[in-house]
Amino acid sequence: MKKFYAIFTSLTLFSTVAKAQQTICGWITDEQRSPIEYANVIALSVRDSSLVTGAVTDNAGKFLLTLPANSAQVFLRVSGIGYEQRNVSLPLAGDTLLLKSEAKAMEGVTVTAQRPKMAIRNDALVTTIVGSSLAKAGSGNDVLKHIPLLTGKEGSYSVVGRGAAVIYINNRKITDATEIERLNSSDIKDVEVVTNPGARYDATVSAVIRIHTVRKVGDGFGFDVRTSAYYWENWDTYNQLNMYYRRNGLELTAGSAYELDNTYDNQTTTNEVQAANLWTNKWIKKAKYRNTHNNYTFSAAYEFSANHSVGARFFTNLLVGANNAYPNFSTDVLKNNALYDHIESRTNGTTTAIPNKSLSAYYVGKVGKLNIDFNTDYYYGEETELRTTTEQSANYDNRTVTSAGTHANKFFATKLVLSHPLFGGSLSVGNENTFTNHEQSYTNQEGIVTNAASTIKERNNAFFFEYSRLTPIGQLMAGLRYEHVNSDYYDQGVYSTEHSRTYNQWFPSLTFATKIKKVGLQLSYSAKTSRPSYRQLGTNVEYMNRFTRQSGNPTLKPATLHNISLVSNWDIFTFVANYTQTHNKIMHWNEQEGVNENITTLRYRNFKNLPVLTLSLTAAPRIGVWSPQLILFCQKQWFDIERLGSKFDLSKPIWGILWNNTFDFKDNWIAETRLKVTSKGIAENTELTRTTCAFNFSVRKAFLNDRLSVTVGVNDLFNRTANHVILYTNNFKTSVNQEYDSRQAYVTLRYKFNTARSKYKGTGAGQSERKRF
């Protein structure tokens, strides 16, 4: 197999022998003197190769081993994903150790990229990007689309069986989804997918994606620019510019992105309500939306030394002008299957916003053996939606409904994590505090819907610890998180004892990872929570049409999730099994108005228990220029509800296939295809009634040593991604058949000059709270 010549790693060691123990400290770097993070360094007995102790390098490439006083003669074994394992005797003959990459170059032959390598590392499934075909994919989003277990797009991704994922770049939590698009695939070292995050993560975080980039050196000015145009039914565009200045330990960055998104949404909806009479609403919706966004990012980072760095970042997101929606509805209303009324309605909606603002700062340092990581964040945003609906009824009075809804959010958060070696492992302890203020109001001039205004003031104080240690049989990680949440609810400015809540919860986590011959195994357990969003908790009753309302439920309880996952990796195959038991699961439900049985209000409620099993199998070989990746997955739940006086089973599984293909041709030509098929089935209390299929195709050509690239492609060629679904409740059923302009032909141009990875190391504080806004 054609392989790259070794990426060399140099290891500098020094040891001090004390009366009680011996300490070995060193750094691992590549041939450019850039540190290699997460390399494993273990000390083994010369007599029987039994484990004495071990360590993992930090982000500076540093490791520290402490040998017991009575330990026999030992040798070191150094390994890392993408590198050949080496055994090293002590003392070293020299201060440099060369580790060969698993992708070796052969003299006199043309080298082609290798398939992305997958392996289990500690709590994560790791896909190596550098040196693989994915390094030429384009942007960070183009890479994540090919990572096993991930679904989603444009900076918003979920892990199969675990839900929405929080994304980190170089240990910094991202708050701007466009950062993924701004990231060049050639700068990504590897991607980690964590299916059971530990105690250091917020208790609401059920999955994590960690992206590590290749460390680059060099001072000066750099920039990258990208422009994309999309067309089929409408014209859309996305443009961005990022600038960098680096000198010594200082880095200044500034970036801007502009997006114009024009869409249409055609729906056929049938609502059936079985009250004293059977009420049926059948409507056809035709809507057009125009959305524009512009965001700006400014950051500064300074490294005083390898052990101390600080930074700050400011981000603002603007709605340029106003975002507009123009849906039209044609509705037939039936009572006991006989025509009751016909209504033609038109809605004009406009959304305006005060620019969202967020400011974050961090300090990352090391004092002796103590690692310090401190972050603080502030956020403010406010949005107002104005809506006017005009209804013309064939048999009853015409109606005009004017409404205004406002949401305002602000929060402040801090997070401190301290780490120190302990008993041959590493102990981390920390504290995270979040202070949130959420205000929402809804007014209706005609008085058809009651005006409402509510405020929620919430404080979350969390303490946690994590301990990890390499044992003779594998890596063990254990953690415990405690959260005290105090939520004060105000209705029309008056404190509500009934709706205010206090929670005290413990969230344990445990992960064990090992390797048996060539098979990697990871078994983990975690307890998490899913708190209702502020919109779900609100008392606002929003007018949808004269027969349908939508509202929150301030009595909702947080859901508790218990998850067990198994990950296994061998050669080109990866198998993942997730079992999640959710208590107090939050789902849609409905209520009938007391006076008019034909008026339905959609709300939310808690369900006692929802067990879900998810299985996935990935195969990712490489055959010449072709790198296929086939993923098979299945999701099965065991769930039923009381519907129309009897049990209604909602346990039909969902099956799926994801087939990615990359063709890496000569002269920097890359072609990609992506096919995703999802079967009919049921998730929660919603049934998917149509098999969906999405087929994407693209061709990329790079010029000027990959500084300039052009990509041409088509998304959803057959326009088959729109869902057809049915929502079931006790006496209510709604069937929605949706069509929208997911099919797009596009062209993207990128140019980058002297770009390098950001020095910004902040990880963010209270970020999961922002998702509830």
Where in this protein do the model-derived segments appear?
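Short, acidic, small-residue-rich periplasmic hinge/interaction motif at the N-terminus
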Residues: 42-44, 77-83, 93-133, 152-154, ...
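Short acidic/polar hinge/loop motifs at secondary-structure boundaries
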Residues: 146, 172-198
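Outer-membrane beta-barrel translocator/receptor signature
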Residues: 202-209, 217-267, 291-294
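Surface-exposed extracellular loop regions of Gram-negative outer-membrane beta-barrel proteins
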Residues: 212-227, 266, 270, 282, ...
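Face-selective signature of the C-terminal outer-membrane beta-barrel domain
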Residues: 295-320, 343-492, 515-520, 574-576, ...
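Outer-membrane beta-barrel signature, preferentially recognizing the C-terminal barrel domain
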Residues: 455-458, 498-501, 529-583, 600-613, ...
